[in-house]
């Protein structure tokens, strides 16, 4: 993914990416999604260390509500900038959420948080 660091939280909150352009720049195949998934992040104030949003329209996800995997890239960035290993991140989508990230080293990041049941289904054989 492309990771963009914004200067201000308001830049993250106000971001309105051109989904059609991101789709056109990316390419989806039966096996992989290549191309334009984008995360935007900035330093947060007080309650959180950083705030982020994540867009992946090529994969059929215009904006993902809370994305643990993208925070394996975001957390080390802020761990280094803030000189701390435990990062509290807020993903500011309409269903947003808090992620607790522990940067053990550049290869290992633990991400945790609280979940809510969004959907339930049964699949029959």
Q: Where on the chain are the PLM-derived regions?
A:
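Active-site proximal loop and beta-alpha junction motif in alpha/beta enzyme cores
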Residues: 1-125
């Amino acid at each position: 993914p492309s990771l963009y660091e914004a200067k201000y939280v308001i830049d993250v909150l106000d971001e309105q990416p051109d989904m059609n352009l991101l789709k056109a720049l990316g390419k989806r195949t039966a096996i992989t999604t290549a191309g334009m998934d984008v995360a935007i992040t900035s330093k947060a104030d007080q309650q959180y260390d950083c705030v982020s949003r994540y867009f992946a329209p090529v994969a059929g996800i215009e904006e993902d509500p809370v994305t643990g995997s993208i925070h394996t890239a975001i957390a080390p960035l802020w761990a280094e900038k803030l000189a701390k290993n435990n990062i509290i991140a807020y993903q500011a989508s309409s269903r947003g959420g808090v992620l607790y990230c522990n940067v053990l080293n550049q290869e290992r990041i633990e991400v945790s948080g609280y979940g809510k049941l969004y959907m339930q289904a049964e699949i029959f054989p």
